[in-house]
């Protein structure tokens, strides 16, 4: 669903920022 896609995108962004 769209919700899963949005959550996945947010997770990827958060992960990237966390290990920036």
UniProtKB/Swiss-Prot annotation:
Keywords: NAD, Oxidoreductase, Tricarboxylic acid cycle. The keyword NAD applies. Its EC number is 1.1.1.37. InterPro entries: NAD(P)-bd_dom_sf (IPR036291). It is an enzyme of class 1 (oxidoreductase). It catalyses: (S)-malate + NAD(+) = oxaloacetate + NADH + H(+). NAD(+) binds at residues 8-14. It comes from the Bacteria. The keyword NAD applies. GO terms for biological process: tricarboxylic acid cycle. One of its GO terms (molecular function) is L-malate dehydrogenase (NAD+) activity. Belongs to the LDH/MDH superfamily. MDH type 2 family. Catalyzes the reversible oxidation of malate to oxaloacetate. This is Malate dehydrogenase. The lineage of its organism: Bacteria, Bacillati, Actinomycetota, Actinomycetes, Streptosporangiales.
């Amino acid at each position: 669903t769209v919700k899963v896609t949005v959550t996945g995108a947010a997770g990827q962004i958060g992960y990237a920022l966390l290990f920036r």
